[in-house]
């Protein structure tokens, strides 16, 4: 079985061999190559110690000396070169207390998480596959190297990674590996929010985001997002729905493109339904104010998972607006665009369509036509260059100061009033008209 290694990777491997050491491409790059995918990174494992690697290559960076890792720079690209090693006892369900370097490749491969990630390759020895990773690739199976219980006890994040790899590759998780995750799921609480966030985004933006269901069934969401468990357990007795809140959410994830903001929004768009649920006399469920309450919950959840402010703010706005159904007039759409922001606004249509496609067939055609009309008016507003943000106004603070307005709250208040009038009537967005309106406002404030 042959893998065409990049020229620089071959150069590093050959150079190490010329100096008396072994070296192989290893891990995810081998897996992806065998699957016909283009690896994002190329990692190299070697019998050389980090000091020897540094002595051999002219340009290196110390990126993980304590773990035997040196980055070799070739043509402004970095390649991580790591000494064969054996991991010692794990003290925090994430990192080993110490590592021991070895000259035995098999011992290095034994410490790795899954069989599909425990293969090595160079053009001299070919594929080194001690744990039948190639068999599991062909069978589309995620299986731990050795005993799953041991691998997950060493590093609790591996449990999440098992589901994430399954989602990215379209694989199944082997039975014993699944059983070990169910047993050890509470240990995920020892892993930092930042690391969980990375895995969550990779899963959500994969081809199989509905594998959030597996995280739930294996007990992992109970650790980092218990709100999702409640969603899965909340029915929707309502003519607009045919799934529980959680199952509806999983269906909507499949109806938006693999964008982080969109997938996070769909994951959380109905997060408040379980706390907003009411039942009428006919046994129908209602979820009044769930978008507003859900936006606040979304912000708290994303902050808890250490998402950046921009991501959090975008999801907050989209969750808050996802169920808003104003009468479609240019005035209403302009105000919605102003409220949400012109950059984010197009995503709202994707959110609304996905939400609709995850519901029952009741009035589905009408709902989709409403969204289409909403989008048509939005595009007309763009084509007409109508003002939907303060920065697009033909008057600004400097203009008002020249008209004698002192800098301060009064100036901001005048701009706000002018903007409100422009949102109602975009024909007013001309410099002379706005100055005349400003003079009237100034006079009224004297």
Each language-model region and where it sits:
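Catalytic cores of the polymerase beta-like nucleotidyltransferase superfamily
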Residues: 1-446
């Amino acid at each position: 079985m042959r893998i065409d290694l990049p020229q620089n990777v071959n150069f590093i491997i050959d150079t190490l061999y010329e100096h008396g050491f072994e070296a192989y491409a290893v891990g995810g790059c081998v897996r992806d190559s065998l699957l016909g995918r283009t690896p994002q990174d190329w990692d190299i494992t070697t019998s050389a110690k980090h000091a020897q690697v540094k002595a051999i290559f002219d340009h290196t960076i110390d990126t993980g000396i304590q773990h035997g890792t040196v980055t070799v720079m070739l043509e402004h690209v970095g390649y991580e070169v790591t000494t064969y090693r054996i991991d010692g006892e794990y003290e925090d369900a994430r990192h080993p207390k110490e590592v021991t370097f070895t000259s035995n490749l098999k011992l290095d491969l034994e410490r790795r998480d899954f069989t599909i990630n425990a293969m090595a390759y160079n053009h001299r020895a070919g594929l080194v596959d001690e744990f039948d990773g190639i068999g599991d690739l062909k069978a589309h199976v995620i299986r731990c190297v050795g005993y799953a219980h041991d691998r997950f006890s060493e590093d609790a994040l591996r449990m999440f990674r098992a589901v994430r790899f399954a989602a990215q590759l379209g694989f199944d998780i082997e039975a014993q590996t699944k059983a070990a995750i169910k047993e050890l799921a509470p240990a995920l609480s020892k892993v930092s929010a930042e690391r969980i966030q990375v895995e969550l985004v990779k899963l959500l933006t994969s081809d199989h985001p509905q594998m959030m269901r597996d995280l739930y069934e294996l007990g992992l969401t109970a650790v980092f997002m218990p709100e999702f468990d409640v969603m899965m357990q909340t029915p929707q007795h309502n003519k607009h729905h045919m799934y529980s809140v959680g199952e509806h959410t999983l269906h909507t994830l499949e109806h938006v493109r693999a964008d982080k903001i969109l997938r996070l929004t769909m994951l959380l768009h109905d997060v408040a339904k379980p706390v907003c649920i009411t039942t009428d006399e006919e046994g129908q469920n209602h979820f009044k104010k769930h978008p507003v309450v859900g936006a606040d919950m979304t912000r708290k959840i994303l902050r808890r998972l250490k998402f950046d402010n921009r991501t959090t703010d975008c999801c907050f706005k989209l969750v808050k607006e996802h169920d808003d159904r104003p009468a479609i007039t240019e005035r209403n759409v302009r105000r919605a665009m102003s409220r949400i922001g012109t950059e984010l606004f197009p995503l709202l249509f994707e959110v609304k369509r996905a939400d609709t496609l995850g519901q029952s067939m009741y009035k589905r055609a009408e709902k989709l036509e409403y969204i289409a009309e909403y989008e048509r008016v939005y595009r007309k507003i763009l084509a007409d260059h109508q003002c939907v943000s303060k920065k697009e106004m033909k008057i600004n603070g400097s203009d008002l100061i020249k008209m004698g307005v002192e800098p301060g709250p009064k100036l901001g208040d005048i701009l706000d009033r002018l903007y409100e009038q422009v949102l109602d009537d975009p024909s007013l967005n001309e410099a002379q008209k706005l100055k005349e309106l400003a003079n009237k406002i100034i006079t009224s404030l004297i």
